[in-house]
Amino acid sequence: MSLWVVKVGTSLLRGNEKQSTAEVIESYSACLSASLKRGDHVVLVTSGAVGLGCNRLGLSQRPVDVVALQGTAAIGQGQLMALYEAAMSRRGHTVAQVLLTRSDLGSRQRYRNASSTLKQLLDWGVLPVVNENDALSPEELRYGDNDTLSALVATAVEADQLIMLTDVDRLYSSDPRINASAEPISDVYHPHELTALEVAAGEGGAWGTGGMTTKLAAARIATASGITVLLADGRDPQVLDGLLQGRRSGTVFHPHPQPLGNRKSWLAHALKPLGTLQLDEGACDALQHRGASLLLVGVKEVEGNFEANQPVRLINPEGNELARGLCSLSSKELREAIETQMSTNRSPVVVHRDVLVLRNA
């Protein structure tokens, strides 16, 4: 028995001249049903609410205004669930709607509640259908077409594998739709490879278009938690059917050999940093090579405004992110402490190692 998280993006659910959105969902549902009947557990993370809402209102263009986007999402979400409910119930399955926001997963208690609820639904043999709560999300629908959400959900339920379906057949060194010499990438083994790909994406190279950058970020989150990530072609439902039966397709992102525990993964990925601490070389070395806590003496600059025990980024002198953690002092207290530390021998702990996660840990 395997525990799968399957993510279906907006581009695949728009429909085309060959298939309507309802027919696309019907095809995916047949694959998911077969997996459930084999005894697997499956969580579906799906986009598509805004598009269906636009269709219902007769809008030819996706709204730009945030309130209009939230309104179309509210209209479309009911239609989206109705399509999945109809397709799965015809095959004898029950579905459950789970709507999440970044603030839900950023609260440790609500994260644990979401995890427990999803696991209970899976124990009952139910198919949880997860989407961002676009109608209420204060982050202006910026989760990244649910890529990041799917990785956080996979971590929360401790999935074996995350399947991200997209409109290309695998990862390439550059966009194959505009570069005929783009090279296919079948395997990504190490966080350093992910880092190189993310840099290339930022420069318009690998995954620089079509929302691929967010898929790289999602792969980093999931693989750091010990989850295998499969990026594959979602235009052909038979690809999904094969993946759910263990056949290989697309690009495989292999899990980190020393995965983060659930709490550390939450610290590293579910929280949105509210500030940044720039460290000196000595502090960077202590964190990276000695497993130390961050002491006040190692903090050179403080950016942003935050309260005590809120998340911050830790960067090296070159400005590269080294780690994330919960700062024991508020930004105001920390700035004052930095100014006065020359007159005292005390160097209190700013981020304890128990609530600190290295970027490539």
Curated annotation (Swiss-Prot):
UniProt pathway annotation: Amino-acid biosynthesis; L-proline biosynthesis; L-glutamate 5-semialdehyde from L-glutamate: step 1/2
Binding site for substrate: 47, 134, 146
SMART domains named in the record: PUA
Keywords: Amino-acid biosynthesis, ATP-binding, Cytoplasm, Kinase, Nucleotide-binding, Proline biosynthesis, Transferase
BP GO terms, sorted: L-proline biosynthetic process
Catalytic function, reaction form: L-glutamate + ATP = L-glutamyl 5-phosphate + ADP
Subcellular location: Cytoplasm
Binding site for ATP: 7, 166-167, 209-215
Family matches, as InterPro entries: AceGlu_kinase-like_sf (IPR036393), Asp/Glu/Uridylate_kinase (IPR001048), G5K_ProB (IPR041739), Glu/AcGlu_kinase (IPR001057), Glu_5kinase (IPR011529), Glu_5kinase/COase_Synthase (IPR005715), Glutamate_5-kinase_CS (IPR019797), PUA (IPR002478)
GO CC, alphabetical: cytosol
Matching Pfam families: AA_kinase, PUA
Protein name per the record: Glutamate 5-kinase
Subcellular location, principal: cytoplasm
GO molecular function: ATP binding; glutamate 5-kinase activity; RNA binding
Documented EC number(s): 2.7.2.11
Domain PUA, first and last residues per copy: 274-345
